[in-house]
């Protein structure tokens, strides 16, 4: 089924999430429902706030949006975040939302830039 608009939430708003967020914010077929990062002053958090996008320091706030989110992008690189998201989707019965791993983001950013983009992750725990 074709979509007219993708409703996206992004977890991780630092060096990896910010370039992705910039692309997403400029896409007319994307609605950003929220951005999460532990650092409320992370570059992507400031960008989201400036563009009127909801921000939170609790990534589970985005998971709790439920099936309103089409794609939940996790660029934290933290395995515990991925596991918590998967567990929440299972427990809540959410079979709609797709969780996108940072490796897929790396591929997308690399394709857009025409070169391999290396991801940077400063936080090991969330």
Per-segment meaning from a language model:
Residues 1-5, 60:
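A short, basic/flexible loop-to-alpha-helix module at the beginning of a structural domain
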Residues 4-22:
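Glycine-rich adenosine-cofactor-binding loop
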Residues 7, 31-34, 69-72:
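Short active-site oxyanion
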Residues 13, 33, 37, 74:
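Glycine- and other small-residue-rich loops at beta-strand/loop junctions that grip anionic moieties
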Residues 27-51:
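NAD(P)-binding Rossmann-fold cofactor-contacting core
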Residues 44, 79-126:
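Rossmann-fold NAD(P)-binding glycine/threonine-rich loop
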Residues 54-62, 99:
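Short acidic-hydrophobic, aromatic-tinged amphipathic segments that line or gate anion-handling sites
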Residues 61-84, 96:
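Rossmann-like NAD(P)-binding element
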